[in-house]
């Protein structure tokens, strides 16, 4: 029996994948915050873990990270990948309820870049003019519907 499409648009992830992904994200953030990784680049960089997507069998965790500050994203990803087994071992106690510890894959989180592009587009004069025009039309339609109700 096939699953019905997810109406919330979560990318087809199951509730279990979402829950476990959030637990892994929290545990990874704790390991990074405590500074347990002995790598100069990671130790001197604040790293934001925005999302962790679990594979359907929960054996692969794709971690989306953003280094804050002037750190080179690709260099941070390489450093995290080089320390993935150490990170996995440090996270094991806090994820002891899992049957298997997942393999970690690190990716750059580009959602912040996408948000800033959309924000810049919305602030552009052309879009602001169009949005202002739509607002005037909406106000006129609201007035017309109110006058019709009376």
Curated annotation (Swiss-Prot):
Q: Which domain of life is it from?
A: Bacteria
Stretches the record annotates as Disordered: 128-150
Question: One matching Pfam family, short form?
Answer: RBFA
Spell out the molecular function terms from Gene Ontology: ribosomal small subunit binding
Has UniProt tagged this entry with the keyword RNA-binding? Answer: no
The record's subcellular location field reads: Cytoplasm
Chief location of this protein? cytoplasm
Coiled-coil positions: none
> What UniProt keywords are attached to this protein's entry?
Cytoplasm, Ribosome biogenesis
Instruction: Give the InterPro entries listed for this entry.
Output: KH_dom-like_a/b (IPR015946), RbfA (IPR000238), RbfA_dom_sf (IPR023799), Ribosome-bd_factorA_CS (IPR020053)
Q: Which regions are flagged for Basic and acidic residues bias?
A: 140-150
What are the GO cellular component annotations?
A: cytosol
This protein's record includes keyword Cytoplasm: yes
Write out the GO biological process terms.
Answer: maturation of SSU-rRNA
- Which NCBIfam families did the record assign? PRK00521.2-5, rbfA
Function description: One of several proteins that assist in the late maturation steps of the functional core of the 30S ribosomal subunit. Associates with free 30S ribosomal subunits (but not with 30S subunits that are part of 70S ribosomes or polysomes). Required for efficient processing of 16S rRNA. May interact with the 5'-terminal helix region of 16S rRNA.
Q: Which family does it belong to?
A: Belongs to the RbfA family.
Assembly description: Monomer. Binds 30S ribosomal subunits, but not 50S ribosomal subunits or 70S ribosomes.
For this entry, the protein name equals Ribosome-binding factor A
Q: Which gene encodes it?
A: rbfA
């Amino acid at each position: 029996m096939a699953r019905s499409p997810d109406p919330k648009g979560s990318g087809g992830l199951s509730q279990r994948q979402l829950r476990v992904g959030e637990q892994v994200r929290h545990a990874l953030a704790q390991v990074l915050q405590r500074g347990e990784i002995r790598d100069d680049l990671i130790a001197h960089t604040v790293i934001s873990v925005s999302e962790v997507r679990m594979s359907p069998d929960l054996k692969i965790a794709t971690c989306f990270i953003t280094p804050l500050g002037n750190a080179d994203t690709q260099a941070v990803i390489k450093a995290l990948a080089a320390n993935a087994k150490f990170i996995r071992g440090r996270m094991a106690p806090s994820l002891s309820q899992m049957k298997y510890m997942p393999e970690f894959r690190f990716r750059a989180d580009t959602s912040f870049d996408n948000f800033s592009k959309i924000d810049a587009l919305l602030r552009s004069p052309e879009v602001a003019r169009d949005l202002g025009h739509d607002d005037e039309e909406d106000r006129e339609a609201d007035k017309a519907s109110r006058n019709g109700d009376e």
